[in-house]
Amino acid sequence: MIDENEFKDVADGIHDESTEIKPYQTLLFGLKGDKVESTYGACEGTIASDVDYITQCMQKVVESKRQLFHLVPVRTNLEIRPNTLSFRASKLGECFLKCVQMDLDRVTDKYPTLGKYNPYFGMFHQAVTCEVEFVNGVALFNTVAREEWLRFRDRDFWPDETLALFVDCLNEAVEQIRREGNSNAFRDWKKAFERQPNENQQTLWSLILACLNVNHHLSILRFDLGYAQYYCDPDLSGALAITYDKVRRHRAALRRFLKQELKKRLRPGACKGMGFAIKGEYGLDKTYHFHVIVILNGDVVGEDISVTETICDQWRDTITNGKGGAYNCNKASYRERGIGSIRYSDEKLRILRTKVVPYVTKPDFYIGMVKPEKHRSFWPSHPPKIEASRRGRRRGKSESWGIVDSSAQAK
């Protein structure tokens, strides 16, 4: 227990600790008549948004050092209130309390093994679902805290002894999460979890550089592919529901289209020095989906939006027979745009390297829940062959070194 002035000093000292939780935003596809349309934006109150919030919060808790919860003495009228202590939480502590208020049973009922694939959720679930002996008997801590304490605006209405028990349980849960999150076993898991995405990132960037060696002017197409929510839920769509085997066939058909058919629909030379990469992911809200990059000859392809739409139409109408949805990123507006027309010396090439490529190849907690261990989730094309004779002015060393340096710094 600390006094009010000491708590203010502690609170002032934790402003340097990161407490920002990014709002959960997602891309979903829904049926509208006989068409599949996309919507992108904030999506609160879902299982996916709750798990995302818990994950971000636990990442910050693992990195934090200070105590998050305290009791401070206050002057009260004991005839009106049964206590002389008041509950205080730091900013990160408030984020932790929001996690405690979430319905974890809703998550684990639908995804019983979620904690295995997302250890941040697993460590939180284990830490707050411990049994605690209260006055009326033994109960799960998170259940009592959520249903009988945090649901009320006044957190101090309990007797001092009960408030002290809540604070002790919360701080012990935080310490348990910190111990696990900073253990050698967890660090080994994290290193292994990030290894393949890091390799995929380097593979994709090397592919882009190889395409730049063939064409000094690129047209970068970016689009996301998925399925209408109706077909993602077997309870709604029954035998029409999307399965892992169907997704594999759709991905193979997309790859064949990009390798063999796309060039037949574009102007001659558009696919000279072409490259592409497909990344498969699984979301708790939208289930199976893909992030795709296609690299074309920028001197020939001027309308990147329409070419991207051609591929998206093929996915929607032919490959998935109307079950699939597509989002044309080239049509959207971005504050930092690393797609579309890109030349070797463009600032957009840096954005492509530092923003677009890492996003496409980012780690995915949940793909392991639905695919066999030996199956891949990233499919890059082979790099284009570099011709012995190259046209155009000779690139200076400073230009070449600039790209190599930025690549090395991003590792």
Mark where each language-model region is.
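Catalytic "initiation/cleavage/transfer" segments centered on a nucleophilic residue
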Residues: 2-11, 15, 27-87, 190-214, ...
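Extended repeat-based interaction scaffolds and adjacent low-complexity, acidic/S/T/P-biased segments
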Residues: 1-169
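Long, contiguous juxta-domain segments that are non-catalytic but functionally important
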Residues: 136-213
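A short acidic (Asp/Glu
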Residues: 234, 287-291, 304
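Signature for HUH/AEP ssDNA processing cores
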Residues: 206-278
